[in-house]
Amino acid sequence: MSVAAEQNARAAAGDQRPTMTEAARIYARMSWLRIRRGRMVWMAAALFALPLVYVAGLAIAGHWGRGLFDDINELYFRFLIPFVPALTASAAVAEEIENKTFTFVFARPAPRGALVIGKLWATTAPAVAVVVPSLALAWVVAQLRFSGDMADTWPHLLRVELAAVLGLCAYGALAAAIGTLFSRHPLVAVLVYLMLIETLLASAPIVLNLVTIAWHLRNIAELPLPDTAFMAVTVPWWGSALAALAVTPGLVSLTTIGVNGAEYRTDR
C-alpha cells in the first residue's frame, strides 16, 4: 500500500491521530524513498567502501594484525562516522522546516517527534547496516596472516562495533539538531561544528575534550586518546558508552522542540 493510500484509508476509518510508531514508520518510508533516488546516498556508500580498499592495499604492502585494523579504525572514527551523517542527516528535518511541509503529511496532526525519529531512522539504519559488516570484514582481512590471534582480538572488534553504532546514531542526531537550528544552511553549520568541536577540541590536550562525542567513541574503541595537560583523566569504556548512548535521545528531544517551534518562527 502506498503512503497516500495508507493515509486515505486511515482517514476513511475515522482515525483521530496516528500513533508515534505509525507516523515514524511512514516518515521513515517516505524519507528512504526520497534518499535512495538522490545522489547523496550513493556518495555515502562510496565513502564507506574506501576503508575496504585501504585495508586491502595495506595488507598487500605487508601490514597485518591489530595495528592494521586500528589504522582502518582511524579512518572510520576521524572522518567517516562523523562526516557521512552530516551529508545524509543534516538536511533531513531542515528541509521540512524550510519548505513548511512537516504539517501536511497526515490528515490529522501527527506527533512531531515521529518526524524526527522517522527521518533519523531512514538515514542512520542504512549506514549502520553498511558499517557493521565492513568493520568485521576489515578485521578479518587484518587477521588473515595471524589467524590464531582472532580469539584474542575479537573483544576489541566488539568494542569497535559498539562505538561505531553509537557514533552513527549520535552524529546523525547531532546533524539533525544543528540542521534544524540552522535550517537555511544545515550542511555548512554541521561541518563547521564537526571541524571546530569534534575534530579540534576532541584532539586538544585539555579536559574539555570530554564533552565531545569523538573522545568517548575513541575511548570505547580502544583508540589512542590525546594527553590531558595538568591532570590525568580516566573514564571507563562503559562510562563513555553510557555517555554516547545518552546523546542520541537528548538531541532527538532538542530537534523535536525545534520542529515544534518552527511553525511559529518569523525569521523565514
Predicted region positions:
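Aromatic- and glycine-rich beta-strand/loop motifs that create alpha-glucan
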Residues: 2-45
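Terminal transmembrane helical anchor/hairpin motif
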Residues: 2-7, 58-66, 181, 186, ...
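Secretory targeting signals
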Residues: 11, 15, 52-92, 116-185, ...
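Cytoplasmic juxtamembrane interface segments
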Residues: 15-21, 93-106, 170-197
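Membrane-interacting alpha-helical segments
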Residues: 21, 25-36, 114, 155, ...
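Helix-loop-helix units of permease transmembrane domains in multi-pass membrane transporters
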Residues: 28, 91-126
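Transmembrane helix-loop junction
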Residues: 34, 95, 108, 139-143, ...
